[in-house]
Amino acid sequence: MSDHPSPERGAVLSADDIARLLPHRHPFFLLDRVTALEPGTSAEAIKNITSSDDVLAGHFPGRMIYPGVLLVECVAQLAAVVYGTAGALRATGEIVGDVADRVGYLAEIRQAKFLKPVVPGDQVVFRLQSGPRVGGLISVTGQASVGRDPVLTVRLAVTERDA
């Protein structure tokens, strides 16, 4: 991460910043921008869906729908940003230390409800809120919406990486 806040409009973390935090790469690097971040607690991010997204090539012929499981993965990647930056994000926006070593894993999809299809041209807004920690698992709740319409609610369990 640079020593200066991202120049992108509305970005707390740009796509380049997120790429420095997460081990994911194309085609599974999914978040475009983090627009709000409270390390260790909550965040908001966006993903723009385009007809050129690789996953839409065959999902579904004649009616492109973004796969629901990848919406869940977006929430899991946002959880990795939230917990990876805990204790490492300075007020200047600078990340200190090697955050990638702290990014954990998706352990469980406890509940997922897909409320509306997501299609090319949609901008999906993801919101994540931290929940209780039980042993090595952290509960999180996430929502996704397109405009004012909710498209996903999900409850996950994530882990921190073993030191």
Language-model features: locations:
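HotDog/MaoC-like acyl-thioester-processing domains
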Residues: 2-11, 23, 39, 117-163
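Hydrophobic beta-strand-centered segment that forms part of the acyl-chain substrate-binding groove
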Residues: 3-6, 10-12, 79-125
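Catalytic strand-loop segment that frames the active site of acyl-thioester-processing enzymes
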Residues: 24-66, 70-71
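Conserved positions in beta-strands of structured domains
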Residues: 32-35, 110, 115, 129-131
